[in-house]
Amino acid sequence: MSFTGIFHFFTNSPCDAAEPWQLGSQDAATPMMQGIIDLHHDIFFFLILILVFVSRILVRALWHFHSKKNPIPQRIVHGTTIEILRTIFPSIIPMFIAIPSFALLYSMDEVVVDPAMTIKAIGHQWYRTYEYSDYNSSDEQSLTFDSYTIPEDDPELGQSRLLEVDNRVVVPAKTHLRIIVTSADVPHSWAVPSSGVKCDAVPGRLNQISISVQREGVYYGQCSEICGTNHAFTPIVVEAVSRKDYGSRVSNQLIPQTGEA
């Protein structure tokens, strides 16, 4: 964890963007990401146990059975107890790791039957197009806009370098969302670490993910599929606002377009 991450830890301030020298995960913004963090901690617990156990056996063997203390090594042809233990325990530990891992994996693949909102994310070289297809179903209106990265020499005060865009994806917090991901040219990827999602954008194919952002904030992500020269300069910015403010934020920032984009 970086010094900035330690500062966030003690001040209880969320970490929703990549930081220099960051080693840990970003703070969870969705139940999916919280599940990933919990699984990481659970697996790390078993790794520590294995490390301590193996290290103790190794140190004990080096200390008690080196050549000076034991010039004539003892030959053990058969050990039933040891063979049983070394077979059972390596079989049980992967079970404790696999069961929660598969449970999380299947939950990540679940799709909400009736999402409150659907957003389509289309990858381009090197920007993204977002479509709020059900922005106003009664008027058959949709919102479509392009999202470009802000150049390195043109950020405003407080904006993250090469992580900010001109048009953010504004979503309501604590709402079930369906995001449809595709590409218009080459393979891309739509990934936001704080949300625990990474979905490939494949030309001619529609992939979908379901998320529910649990707290308001601004969440940063990047393309995670090498897509050409400017692959590193296609960030993703998702801004979660309250349901009360969502309508006014979208209406003020974006221009509705009638019909499909």
From Swiss-Prot:
Domain of life: Eukaryota
Record-listed E.C. numbers: 7.1.1.9
Keyword set includes Transmembrane: yes
Cofactor remark from the record: Binds a dinuclear copper A center per subunit.
Residues binding Cu cation A2, per UniProt: 223, 225, 227, 231
Required cofactor(s): Cu cation
Residue sites binding Cu cation A1 per the record: 188, 223, 227
Binding site for Mg(2+): 225
Catalytic reaction equation(s): 4 Fe(II)-[cytochrome c] + O2 + 8 H(+)(in) = 4 Fe(III)-[cytochrome c] + 2 H2O + 4 H(+)(out)
Reported function: Component of the cytochrome c oxidase, the last enzyme in the mitochondrial electron transport chain which drives oxidative phosphorylation. The respiratory chain contains 3 multisubunit complexes succinate dehydrogenase (complex II, CII), ubiquinol-cytochrome c oxidoreductase (cytochrome b-c1 complex, complex III, CIII) and cytochrome c oxidase (complex IV, CIV), that cooperate to transfer electrons derived from NADH and succinate to molecular oxygen, creating an electrochemical gradient over the inner membrane that drives transmembrane transport and the ATP synthase.
Name of this chain's protein: Cytochrome c oxidase subunit 2
Origin species: Daucus carota (Wild carrot)
Taxonomic placement: Eukaryota, Viridiplantae, Streptophyta, Embryophyta, Tracheophyta
Gene from which this protein is expressed: COX2
